[in-house]
Amino acid sequence: MNNNDLLYEVALGKDSELIIITYAIKYSNCDFIHAVQVKPFIRSNYTKIFESKKLNNFVDIGYYDNPIIKTYGFTKKKELAELYKEKYEKLIKFAYYDNLISDKIETIDYYKTKEFELKKEIATINAKINSFN
């Protein structure tokens, strides 16, 4: 890939054993492609976090065992790609908090509050995303 193809690539938030990877690729017929995968972060395999390859107008960022969330989308608007990026950053935190709650940790009320706040923020982002349609 040359510099014109790769617009951005970000590995975000290693909260405990979770990681989110977001990136956008520029193609001649589609300005932005946004791909996200959230998965358990396998420390023993950290040197090969993901593989990428172009498939027509799509980006395949590989597959992992038991992904928590796996979704792909594409847009010609950078603002929309950024909204999706923000949404999935929040979803990874939500999954992390939900995991802690299911483990019945002592600070369960704190994490339930955090989950509630994230749900509201995600709903706001979804409304912005829907306004593009």
Q: Where are these predicted regions, by residue range?
A:
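Extended alpha-helical coiled-coil "stalk/arm" regions
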Residues: 101-126
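Short coil-to-beta transition motif at edge beta-strands of beta-rich domains
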Residues: 1-19
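Amphipathic alpha-helical interface segments
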Residues: 10-15, 25, 60-61
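Short beta-strand-centered aromatic/proline hotspots
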Residues: 17-29
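Intrinsically disordered, low-complexity, charged/polar segments
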Residues: 39-105, 110
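Short, solvent-exposed secondary-structure boundary/capping segments
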Residues: 30-38
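Short, solvent-exposed coil/turn segments at beta-strand boundaries
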Residues: 1-3, 26-31
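Short intrinsically disordered terminal tails
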Residues: 1-3, 127-133
